[in-house]
């Protein structure tokens, strides 16, 4: 089979005006970025259609390091729905350069289920990540200037919380000292970098309802504390307008197309392990405004991305999924059955059966939210029918819908079984009204423990002295009502990435809580999770090149 980039290159793309016309989106509203991409103004969102639309969430079991193909399934499902005569649009996150050149590679789908032009989408795209990075670091520069200019006055700060960001994986930037040199070079202090998808600006971009809401959220960003212990925000710095200007175009969703010319809105890119892991509310609303079905995904496993999608994004958006599709693969299931990562491609029915406990946990958890769940088996070319049957029979025994997705190899035709099952369930057995894992009035510790014990099956939750200190500051600022966004490893229900399967009864340690006042959530750091990833021994970057003007090795 051809490589992803070869397949993408062989597709004859339609001009973006044709894609817009296919969903009755007025062409004169488009703000083109070349021939095949356009920004769409927020005025195109139809709130009445948003409320009536069929939102489909795609999530997954706990993944292996290479992932389970959730984006490919999301795109494939949209292709499949269009293949059977339904009007479907997919809404996805934008890829980050960190993983693209790091371990996982790109995030534009795979095979014959991709969003295009994949090279542009995987690289700089429309500059949204650059805008977020620039806005974040502009705040840092202006904050540093404020500190410098007020170094000899009573207006100084006693504690600074705001870091810098870059869209790269670079472990050496996790901790840094700035302001070295002479006094004219700034005030020395210890700080660090996060990756751009973990930026509070990214979260704000993805949760904002409109430009006014974006600006309001920017004003509320907590930067540090004064010498009197009062919160110091972007509003106090007086720069919200300047930062909003940097994001005036980034807030608009991006319209592209798939390998079969299905419309796709690709916008925003927070990770689900260290942030809330969902594409923008505005892009999802745009998909609901123009499609009969809107397919979207939430990052990593359902314990992370789906929980945050339902508890944070849906609460903000006021819309819930009619159905949740849970992606599973033989490889990930065998990993949870005790097989080493290097051996998961080989047949092993016994390990597969053991690994089904991880699938069952995710199904059970999603049903707690009132979600109707079906399992999408993402097929690889090495998968054996006998082992696929084991998973199918198990799901049937659990009274859970099951469909094989082969969109990677066959495009929309390969997702026909999945698409038909989705339509059947939405029309006859849709999800119940959404049941949140916690309520806003619950104390912060109760919110954390409800997720830890009800979703992760932790035995107990312990707090570091640093986390306890943050809880006091949260109470002092009356921020207890905010939702919690758990930052932990994506490879296990626990904080130990090596603990596979249906792990239970463990201790979950809260090491820190980051107050995202602007985004409107509390980021709860579990264990030693890093908000600036590192690179593997052999990063994807060594395989990427440009030959005769064509990019090679991007996947």
UniProtKB/Swiss-Prot annotation:
Catalyzed reaction equations: (6S)-5,6,7,8-tetrahydrofolate + formate + ATP = (6R)-10-formyltetrahydrofolate + ADP + phosphate
Keywords attached to this entry: ATP-binding, Ligase, Nucleotide-binding, One-carbon metabolism
A Pfam family the protein falls into: FTHFS
The keyword Ribosomal protein is assigned to this record: no
GO biological process: tetrahydrofolate interconversion
Pathway(s) annotated for this protein in UniProt: One-carbon metabolism; tetrahydrofolate interconversion
Statement: the UniProt record of this protein carries the keyword Chloroplast: no
Broadest EC class assigned to this enzyme: ligase
GO molecular function: ATP binding; formate-tetrahydrofolate ligase activity
Signal peptide: none
Recorded superkingdom: Bacteria
Assigned EC number: 6.3.4.3
Classification via HAMAP family: FTHFS
Alphabetized NCBIfam families for the sequence: PRK13505.1
Family: Belongs to the formate--tetrahydrofolate ligase family.
Entry protein name: Formate--tetrahydrofolate ligase
Source species of the chain: Porphyromonas gingivalis (strain ATCC BAA-308 / W83)
Organism classification: Bacteria, Pseudomonadati, Bacteroidota, Bacteroidia, Bacteroidales
């Amino acid at each position: 089979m051809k490589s992803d980039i070869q397949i993408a290159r062989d597709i004859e793309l339609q001009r973006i005006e044709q894609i817009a016309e296919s969903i009755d989106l007025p062409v004169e509203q488009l703000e083109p970025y070349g021939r095949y991409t356009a920004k769409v103004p927020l005025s195109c969102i139809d709130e009445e259609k948003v409320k009536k639309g069929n939102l489909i969430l795609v999530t997954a079991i706990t993944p292996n390091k290479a992932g389970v193909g959730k984006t490919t399934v999301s795109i494939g499902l949209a292709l499949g729905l269009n293949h059977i005569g339904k009007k479907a649009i997919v809404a996805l996150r934008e890829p980050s350069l960190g993983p693209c050149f790091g371990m996982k590679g790109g995030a534009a789908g795979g095979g014959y289920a991709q969003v295009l032009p994949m090279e542009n989408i995987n690289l700089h795209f429309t500059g949204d990540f650059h805008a977020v990075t620039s806005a974040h670091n502009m705040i840092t520069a202006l904050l540093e200037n404020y500190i410098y200019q007020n170094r000899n006055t009573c207006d100084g700060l006693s504690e600074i919380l705001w870091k810098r960001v870059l869209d790269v994986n670079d472990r050496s930037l996790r901790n840094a000292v700035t302001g070295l040199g002479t006094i004219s070079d700034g005030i020395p202090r210890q700080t660090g970098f996060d990756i751009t998808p973990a930026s509070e600006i990214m979260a704000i971009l993805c949760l904002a309802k409109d430009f006014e809401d974006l600006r309001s959220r920017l004003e509320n960003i907590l930067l540090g504390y004064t010498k009197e212990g009062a919160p110091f925000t972007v509003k106090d710095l007086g720069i919200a307008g300047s930062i909003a200007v940097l994001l005036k175009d980034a807030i608009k969703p991006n319209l592209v197309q798939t390998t079969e010319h299905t419309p796709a809105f690709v916008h925003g890119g927070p990770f689900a392990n260290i942030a809330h892991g969902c594409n923008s509310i505005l892009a999802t609303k745009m998909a609901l405004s123009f499609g009969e079905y809107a397919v979207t995904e939430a990052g990593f496993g359902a314990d992370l991305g789906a929980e945050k999608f339902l508890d944070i994004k849906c609460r903000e958006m006021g819309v819930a999924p009619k159905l949740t599709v849970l992606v599973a693969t033989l490889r990930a299931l065998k990993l949870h059955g005790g097989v080493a990562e290097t051996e998961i491609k080989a047949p092993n029915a016994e390990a597969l059966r053991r690994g089904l406990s991880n699938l069952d946990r995710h199904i059970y958890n999603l049903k707690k939210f009132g979600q109707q769940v079906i399992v999408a088996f993402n097929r690889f070319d090495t998968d054996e029918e006998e082992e696929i049957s084991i998973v199918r029979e198990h799901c049937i025994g659990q009274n859970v819908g099951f469909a094989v997705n082969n969109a990677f190899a066959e495009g929309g035709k390969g997702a026909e079984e999945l698409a038909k099952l989705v339509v059947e369930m939405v029309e006859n057995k849709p999800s119940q009204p959404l049941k949140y894992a916690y309520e806003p009035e619950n104390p912060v510790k109760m919110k954390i423990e409800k997720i830890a014990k009800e979703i992760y099956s932790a035995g107990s939750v312990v707090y570091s002295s640093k986390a306890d200190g943050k809880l006091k500051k949260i109470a002092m600022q009356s921020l207890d009502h905010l939702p919690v966004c758990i930052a932990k490893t994506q490879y296990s229900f626990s904080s130990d990435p090596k603990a596979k399967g249906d792990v239970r009864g463990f201790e979950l340690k809260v090491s820190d809580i980051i107050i995202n006042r602007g985004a409107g959530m509390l980021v709860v750091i579990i264990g030693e999770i890093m908000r600036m990833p590192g690179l593997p021994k052999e990063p994807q970057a060594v395989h990427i090149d440009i030959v005769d003007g064509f990019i090679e090795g991007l996947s």
